[in-house]
Amino acid sequence: MTVATNPPRTKLALRAGGDFRFAVVADTHSKPHPASAQRLAELEPDAILHAGDIGDLAVLDELAKVAPVFAVRGNIDGPSDVPELRLIELTSADTLKLRILLVHIAVYGPKLRADVARVATKERASLVVCGHSHVPFIGRDRALSVFNPGSIGPRRFQLPIVLGAIDIRAGSARLRHIDCETGKPWTPPSVHVT
């Protein structure tokens, strides 16, 4: 599978103070968790990114009740007007502040797929937002930040049901996960090896 090139671009303006918040979701599979709408509303996002495996496109209409939605198709999604990948450009006074490549399948484990890294580099993105694995993840590879929000769809294996947030303040972006069931910050469990 090779990712398409020349993704559509969406330009968004930072708020007057230079702040912006994205809620980030993925892998809804037509059945977002019952608490997901409340959790998203609590975040008060400026926009919502959906990193694919939407399922029924009515899911996007429900998300749009909270904030404008920008989505990409996932591997379970059929043909539609939803693109395979998308560039999100945050600007302030016509100056680019952050460029995000939104794509469904981007990583193998903690490493970016070569085709995704090529597109992100060509498009000068600094952050790749993806879905597919249902595994919440924040990492870096090939000088790019990588963010998988996890899934707010049906539970898969023993994975948590989580969503993500990208908070832009004072020129920097903070990536975080929120437990959809409790509304509390989510961090990976600690493992102690003896």
Which stretches of residues belong to each language-model region?
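N-terminal active-site segment of His-dependent metallophosphoesterases
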Residues: M1-V69, D77-K97, L159-I161, V193-T194
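Active-site neighborhood of phospho(di)ester-bond hydrolases with catalytic His/Asp-centered motifs
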Residues: V24-D27, A47-D53, V69-N75, L101-H104, ...
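Pre-active-site segment of Zn-dependent metallo-hydrolases
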Residues: T28-E42, L102-K122
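Short, small-residue-enriched loops and turns at beta-alpha junctions
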Residues: H29-S30, G78-P79, G109, R155, ...
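A short, polar/proline- and glycine-enriched secondary-structure boundary/capping micro-motif
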Residues: P34, K111-D115, Q158, G183-H192
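Conserved beta-sheet core of the metallophosphoesterase superfamily
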Residues: F70, Y108-S172, R176
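Short, flexible active-site-adjacent loop segments at beta-strand->alpha-helix junctions, enriched
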Residues: N75, D94, A106, I152, ...
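Charged phosphate-binding loop/patch that engages nucleotide di/tri-phosphates or the phosphate backbone
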Residues: R169-T194
